């Protein structure tokens, strides 16, 4: 299609349509993935009509065998190319994917090269011409070894990234320059399992965490510290409903106690909901505000102690609320902003920072004293 003759309005409409199509087909893909995962899970459930533990075990074991097989074969291939003995170039693997380290190959073929575009071009080319056929050949060999009726194992290159950071199993960040052939002029973050992708993290914090990760991946520690401190300053001025943790409430009846409001070991969001309901009742606000109900979506914040919301001791440090905080609560004076900042923002950051040795604020050291 020749886009040069299209008007601006038509180009904008085409762009919007393309964005909608991308979202639509991505959702279709995710639906199929979830359906397949559900089917596998159901096979191992004794209440499913087609329950069969042997089938469930076969699915699990064939997946483990396939990914371990190809990881070992790619290590053999890389060691053969580089003459590196038995070095492990597979830095991570998951159910259906592996992450391969190409640093040594780049240094051998393109010594001293720092242009990311040239490096990505080379990796894209060599994967298509050499690694994809090699992987397919190895799966054919595995199929023959296992005497399969037909080999259905296929792998394709997903992303090319210059940096990766793992905080735990299935929790990682990649600085992506190419994703399935789509090239980015500035790297795009692929974030899996980190709090920026979780609905249980306040929306404004998710946004700022993502920007912090971008700085970690592409800038320096001083820039990062300055950004964190600037956000902390703005965070302290935000209203409670913007910085509160989103949750769903389950178990209100189970954890209710008529004398102490809630029982021991009550989950924090439920505890906050019971305290909220208690105050709606004792402050006689029931005609103006509904109490929180079972299964309802709420938010909760940490409170300073003592405060007027809990029992007689005033030591309860949390309160939940639905979409609207009753103005009669006058809650702003009691929200523990420092603790809320720590729990929503600093704690997720620190799970990343402990792996790279960075700090969230500048600290005086013996070296800095003499500098």
Q: Regions from the language model: what does each represent?
A:
Residues 1-33, 52, 60-95, 103-371:
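DNA-dependent DNA polymerase catalytic subunits
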Residues 35, 39-42:
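Function-dense linear segments that define catalytic or interfacial modules
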Residues 45, 97:
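Short, electropositive, low-hydrophobicity segments enriched in small/polar residues
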Residues 46-58:
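Short, conserved non-catalytic motifs in the polymerase core
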């Amino acid at each position: 299609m020749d886009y040069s003759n299209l008007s601006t309005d038509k180009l904008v409409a085409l762009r919007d349509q393309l964005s909608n199509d991308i979202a639509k087909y991505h959702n279709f893909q995710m639906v199929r993935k979830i359906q397949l995962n559900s089917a596998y899970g159901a096979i191992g459930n004794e209440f499913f009509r087609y329950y069969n533990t042997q089938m469930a075990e076969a699915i699990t074991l064939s997946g483990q065998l396939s990914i371990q097989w190809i990881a070992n074969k790619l290590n053999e291939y890389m060691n053969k190319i580089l003459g590196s003995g038995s070095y492990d170039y597979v830095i991570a693997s998951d159910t259906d994917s592996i992450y391969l380290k190409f640093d040594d190959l780049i240094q051998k073929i393109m010594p001293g090269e720092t242009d990311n575009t040239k490096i990505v071009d080379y990796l894209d080319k060599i994967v298509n011409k050499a690694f994809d056929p090699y992987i397919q050949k190895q799966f054919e060999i595995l199929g023959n070894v296992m005497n399969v009726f037909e080999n259905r194992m296929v792998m394709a290159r997903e992303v090319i990234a210059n940096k990766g950071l793992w905080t735990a199993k299935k929790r990682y960040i990649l600085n992506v320059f190419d994703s399935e052939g789509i090239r980015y002029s500035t790297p795009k973050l692929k974030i899996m399992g980190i709090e920026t992708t979780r609905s249980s993290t306040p929306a404004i914090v998710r946004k700022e965490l993502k920007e912090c990760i971008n700085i970690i991946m592409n800038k320096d520690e001083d820039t990062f510290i300055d950004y964190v401190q600037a956000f902390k300053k703005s965070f302290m001025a935000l209203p409670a409903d913007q910085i509160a943790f989103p949750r769903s409430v389950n178990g209100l009846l189970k954890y209710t106690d008529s004398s102490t409001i809630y029982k021991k070991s009550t989950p924090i969001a439920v505890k906050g909901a019971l305290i909220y309901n208690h105050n709606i009742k004792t402050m006689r606000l029931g005609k103006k505000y509904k109490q929180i109900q079972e299964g309802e979506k709420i938010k909760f914040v940490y409170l300073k102690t003592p405060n007027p919301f809990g029992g007689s001791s005033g030591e309860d440090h949390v309160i939940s609320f639905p979409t609207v905080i009753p103005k009669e609560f006058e809650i702003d004076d009691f929200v523990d902003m420092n603790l809320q900042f720590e729990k929503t923002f600093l704690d997720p950051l620190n799970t990343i920072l402990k792996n790279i040795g960075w700090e969230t604020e500048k600290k005086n050291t013996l070296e800095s004293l003499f500098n």
